Amino acid sequence: MIVLLVSLVLAGCIYYANARRVRRSRLPPGPPGIPLPFIGNMFDMPSESPWLRFLQWGRDYHTDILYLNAGGTEIIILNTLDAITDLLEKRGSMYSGRLESTMVNELMGWEFDLGFITYGERWREERRMFAKEFSEKNIRQFRHAQIKAANQLVRQLIKTPDRWSQHIRHQIAAMSLDIGYGIDLAEDDPWIAATQLANEGLAEASVPGSFWVDSFPALKYLPSWLPGAGFKRKAKVWKEGADHMVNMPYETMKKLTVQGLARPSYASARLQAMDPDGDLEHQEHVIRNTATEVNVGGGDTTVSAVSAFILAMVKYPEVQRQVQAELDALTSKGVVPNYDEEDDSLPYLTACVKEIFRWNQIAPLAIPHRLIKDDVYRGYLIPKNALVYANSWAVLNDPEEYPNPSEFRPERYLSSDGKPDPTVRDPRKAAFGYGRRNCPGIHLAQSTVWIAGATLLSVFNIERPVDGNGKPIDIPATFTTGFFRHPEPFQCRFVPRTQEILKSVSG
């Protein structure tokens, strides 16, 4: 009996090993990892700049599509736009699932966000509502809030220019609340810190393989005080931030509505448009969730883009001078331009905004798609439930498409006559995601950066800091290495271009 049992176990092991070997031969190439269940490439996963490691692995294995298995989670990496387009765009119905993360969705409470909702009717309903209001056609209805935030940013920079980073974060947050809920935001409002905390947690938890609980969901039942359960303590703090980010502005808007003091906003307009004969609780839940999308985009990604714009102007003063020459030709020196002709009247500034989203790729790996059924691509098996990461950093730093990709060069998008060159790939598509899961806030984000850039360079020369002898100090163009990418902290000076504009803006 014992011999029979041992034989059966041995036969099972041999069968498992052979089946695994046969299946692995059908998968895309990738690093071998440790051939044990729930281990695989877990210890290969980079915690910093994973997009660089994935690109290097692609070169090592001579492929633009990689397979990894991190703790039982199957991962596909796409390193070229061709592969990304073939799968995420052309086969979008199969690749529109989303990461179902125990850490992010359950423990941190991000189930409200479109980026983490499972593909289905709820996702379609919420995305349809948000995308309609924030489409390219409708985005101008929010321009007053964008201009107001840009002008207020200038006033804050005149008073305390050394706090420029905090001022950007505050004004982008204030704009988001104005658009989403029609409410004001004090400079020291705790909502800002809560939003920043929630977004920082999301950035850390979104790195592939960053928390074991995503591979072993049963770990979520561990007591938070237990050694090794630090992830639960982190999740608790991050969830408090996310809950405050979602609920505070919505409840404030509702109170103002009852008092008759609410200003027009996305949320108030949606509430007024609710079907009185429908499920009111459900309709309000959809409005609450979609209004939060304005905060999520403004709370981190737009702040990163505006900060990168300032960094680029400091590092590339010749670009700054050319933008200012374009602005001055449209109006006069020190006069903030009319924003009705965003793309046509200031093509070089528009090219700068395109280059910002390429040069400072905010989400280098985007948010992963999940395959809803087995697929075959180029003869490779792409397994059901695999997480599919598009390496946008690789796409936007492709030297064949963007020569000298580490350099900030807006002119790459313009022809010799200074007009947009349609033959150059617009980087904003890759910067804002792919297929049915692309970011519906793209038009709000890019117009916010455009207006902020035009306003800042109309009023200021943005210059390098100086040492004790008045000599300019060079600053490096360095960026964070987490899932969401930002410029590392740096110093700069905001020097008013004319006394007249200084008096005008201050007044």
Curated annotation (Swiss-Prot):
Annotated GO biological process: psilocybin biosynthetic process
Compositionally biased tracts (Basic and acidic residues): 408-425
Keywords linked to the UniProt accession: Heme, Iron, Metal-binding, Monooxygenase, Oxidoreductase, Signal
Key word Metal-binding present: yes
Biotechnology: The pharmaceutical interesting psilocybin as a treatment option against depression and anxiety is being investigated in advanced clinical trials.
Binding site for heme: 439
Sequence segments annotated as region (Disordered): 403-425
Named cofactor requirement(s): heme
The keyword Transport is assigned to this record: no
PROSITE patterns assigned to the protein according to its UniProt record, in alphabetical order: CYTOCHROME_P450 (PS00086)
Role noted for this protein: Tryptamine 4-monooxygenase; part of the gene cluster that mediates the biosynthesis of psilocybin, a psychotropic tryptamine-derived natural product. The first step in the pathway is the decarboxylation of L-tryptophan to tryptamine by the decarboxylase psiD. PsiD does not decarboxylate phenylalanine, tyrosine, or 5-hydroxy- L -tryptophan (5-HTP). 4-hydroxy-L-tryptophan is accepted as substrate by psiD as well. The cytochrome P450 monooxygenase psiH then converts tryptamine to 4-hydroxytryptamine.
Official protein name in the record: Tryptamine 4-monooxygenase
Organism: Psilocybe cyanescens
Gene from which the chain derives: psiH
